[in-house]
Amino acid sequence: MTGDRPWHGQCSLQLISKTAADDLQSQLTVHQSQCTAPFKIQRANLDDDGRCQLPLLHTAGGLVGGDQLSVNVKAGASSRGLVTSVAAQKVYGSVGRSKQHPKGLWASQECHFELATNADLEWLPQELVVFQGGLYKQRMQVELQPKASFLSAEVVRLGRTAAGETLNEGAWRSSLEICRQTPIGRQWELVDQLELNSDVLQNLHGMGRQPVFGSFVWAAPDPLTAEVMETLLRNCRTDRANLEGSMACGGLDQGLVARYIGPSSQAARQWFTRIWARTRQLRRLSTPQPPREWPLQEE
């Protein structure tokens, strides 16, 4: 927010696969971008497999009620991209309280991803911290063509627990919709809607007073056989070793979902990073190289 006016930051990204100039047998991905304040794209990096890593910077330092963010990503055929954030996103206590909005206005983010055939996109923002009284909602829509792969991992902290802060009347809402174009038309792969608030945070059948929630989703490029899925889930459960929190995972018709509830953002990120590496192996891709912007990485 600037002055009394809320932000509406917009970021549009296009990923394009091209042949490497120094090796005609290799492909790399380049990008085109257009952003409005407070969004800014920092310098892109290339992974060993030619994947384009794009760090997205939110220069305002946080969100308050009424602020809006819009992210649109188009991944061209056979492109490979990883979009992350430069720092944790903060959602401050809400403003704009009125008779119509007694708890204040919501900060919001809309993300739309379009993946062409054989595209591979990883959406891996850093932690989101909802301050006391903060209101945040997001909607993510993913459109996949055949053999496209989409992977997302998000970690949310409800309240600044280190400062003894609770969520109070704050809340976090999320809607994720993934559909794929098939020979018989558009098929839904996942529709996932969540809301976390103080009641859910305190309820033993909800968050059980644990302040951190994480969600990992992978829409695979091809259906996984029963044997491959069984092995993947078994390995993901083994990967929970020596990490704090409650962790569970399950298969989709064509992919995987994993959830984390616990005290540690670092534990959530470490588990998801291990699963991320498993999915790279199944896609016959290089071992993930965590973006340099991420803190607290495993050795």
UniProtKB/Swiss-Prot annotation:
Keywords: Chaperone, Cytoplasm, Nickel insertion
Function: Required for maturation of urease via the functional incorporation of the urease nickel metallocenter.
PANTHER family: UREASE ACCESSORY PROTEIN D
Subunit structure: UreD, UreF and UreG form a complex that acts as a GTP-hydrolysis-dependent molecular chaperone, activating the urease apoprotein by helping to assemble the nickel containing metallocenter of UreC. The UreE protein probably delivers the nickel.
Upper taxonomic lineage: Bacteria, Bacillati, Cyanobacteriota, Cyanophyceae, Synechococcales
Protein name in UniProt: Urease accessory protein UreD
GO cellular component, one term: cytoplasm
Domain of life: Bacteria
Stored HAMAP family: UreD
